[in-house]
Amino acid sequence: MTQPSLNPLVIKLGGAALSCSQTLSQLFGAIASYQQKEQRQIVIVHGGGYLVDELMEKLQLPTVKKNGLRVTPYDQIPLIAGALAGTANKLLQGQAMADGLNAIGLSLADGGLCQVEELDPELGAVGKATPGDSSLLQTILNAGALPIISSIGLTAQGQLMNVNADQAAVAVAGALDAQLVLLSDVSGVLDGKGHLIKSLNQQEADALIAGKVITDGMIVKVQAALEAANDLGRAIEVATWRYPENLEKLFAGESIGTQFLPA
């Protein structure tokens, strides 16, 4: 098996980092510093729900969620695609360029990277992504660029689709045979004494949920991470961007958060 340090690394960027230029600058600065010394290829996948929420509020349109997924009426998908594949993607690309990186803004559709189909008619223009052809993305990586990929995709019929960013990152990682890190404001899963749990499988997570160690919104995050590990067929990591000094360790293949193990 290839050493994790040699596999490409897909970083799904979420949480408040997307709206904080200082946090983004620390992340991109760490990537630039790391890639001056090492050859590991890194890909960013992002959502941008906060931008969509702001846009919906300005347009006085309701935000409706079902099972944690944004309901996206087909007449609203051009607006949401504009916010995610347009504004959010270009803001991230601009920050990366300002921090010395050769950043390329992409979507799930570019080069056939991910195939996208409608997930559930009741959700509207919400798609499920599956791994596609990574050859164009690999060419971009081989050129030394940092791909920044929005979670907007296209169906085979050319219909715009909004894909959950975690699920999009799993599909991108699958296409690239890459390691996956979900990077957010959550450092990982803590035990009852506030110590970081280094790894979790479904059985261990169920026991912690039953014991009220994992509660509330963290339950959703844990189940989503375990589902991502199962879909990808390898361990994934949930870690935080809050400690920039740890990021280069993460890029080098060290665990700095909680590893979620597939069944």
UniProtKB/Swiss-Prot annotation:
It catalyses: N-acetyl-L-glutamate + ATP = N-acetyl-L-glutamyl 5-phosphate + ADP. The record marks 12, 221 as: Transition state stabilizer. GO terms for molecular function: acetylglutamate kinase activity; ATP binding. GO terms for cellular component: cytoplasm. It comes from the Bacteria. The keyword Transferase applies. Keywords: Amino-acid biosynthesis, Arginine biosynthesis, ATP-binding, Cytoplasm, Kinase, Nucleotide-binding, Transferase. CDD domains: AAK_NAGK-NC. Its main location: cytoplasm. Pathway: Amino-acid biosynthesis; L-arginine biosynthesis; N(2)-acetyl-L-ornithine from L-glutamate: step 2/4. One of its GO terms (biological process) is arginine biosynthetic process via ornithine. The keyword Transcription does not apply. Substrate binds at residues 48-49, 70, 162. Belongs to the acetylglutamate kinase family. ArgB subfamily. Catalyzes the ATP-dependent phosphorylation of N-acetyl-L-glutamate. This is Acetylglutamate kinase. It comes from Vibrio vulnificus (strain CMCP6).
